[in-house]
Amino acid sequence: MAVITNDFKRVTLRKIFDDAQSVTNRYYIGIGKSEPWNDAEAVPTPTGSIRDDRLARQGLQAAKSASNLSFVCTRYNWTSGTIYNAFDDNDLTIGDNTYYVITEDNNVYVCVQEARNSSGVQTASTVKPAHTDPLKAVKLSDGYKWKYLYTVLTTDASNFLSANFAPVRLADSSETGTGALQYAVQNAAVRGQVLGVKVTNGGGGYSSAPTVTIEGDGTGAAATASITGSVVTHIFLDSDADS
């Protein structure tokens, strides 16, 4: 059974994105369907069938050339009192979870470690991330650890930032200001870097915190365990490492 991976989807979108920016190609956004549905309370769901496509074209009233475009992601505003999930590369539903946020400063962060109480239960975020360190994830006083990704540029915010979506882009070496910060973030990204640890089974019978050993073909990963009532409830990463 085949799976259409996110990497495949990204490659496809990139081809469309690049194609749409060619001076020899034109992409249009159309509006139509002025006549009422047979049942206004039960509008049919589009199926993408050949018939649906034909009817949509026949019902076009106007079309506008798309001269500017951007990749976007679902917008999740950072809000005090909200529980956020740390990014998990083994979570099949990660795209539906709030593992990244955008703040009122238009800074975008990814959560690499959520906060938990002494019993290991997730707690809410109460301290807004505001750092722009392009190299390191930062742990805040509420226990959440955030990695700065980028700041939405003013022009991108004006063109593409909406209540539901936020623009995403790649920075290049010619940029300055927040664009240069994002370029530094991109260059500092290390595939396979350990940024957080998730406890799936805390075991039992511990009289003191066990030593944590991270095995892999990288270097520098170090972590510390914390126990409550003889059970491991947290493992805190002591540093960002390439393991």
What does each of the following model-derived ranges do?
Residues 1-108, 112-243:
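Feature for peripheral, non-core segments
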